[in-house]
Amino acid sequence: MPALEVNSVPSSSEFPVAPEKLASIIETSARDASSDDLGACTESILVELSKASSAHKFVVSLTKVAFSDSEDFNLSIDSSIGGSWNKTKDGGYSHSVETEAGARLLATVVWVSK
């Protein structure tokens, strides 16, 4: 798979768990759930995030990007998420994980303080 860059810096100063833990939760859930079942992977991430912080509500979005290496093409994916929220307490985080099948999962976690 070609090089991929994802900005994985939390967008607020207060986040539910350390960025490294967020990445670990996403990677573990992606590895444990079938890459064909995005719903199960999303649910797994939500369960782990809820265990990690009871002070936040969470939204998780997963996008699966898969293509054949034998084809010659350009792939461009742009995504933006925003919210009307408290910028010091609420935020978002994006992370990319390569699956065993060679696909790429792009995960976005959004949190809002309760």
Swiss-Prot record:
Compartment(s): Cytoplasm; Cell projection
Primary localisation category: cytoplasm
Family classification: Belongs to the TDA2 family.
Keywords: Cell projection, Cytoplasm
UniProt feature coiled coil, ranges: none
Chain segments annotated as transmembrane: none
Protein name as it appears in the record: Topoisomerase I damage affected protein 2
Originating organism: Lachancea thermotolerans (strain ATCC 56472 / CBS 6340 / NRRL Y-8284) (Yeast)
Any Gene Ontology CC annotation: cytoplasm
Protein origin, superkingdom: Eukaryota
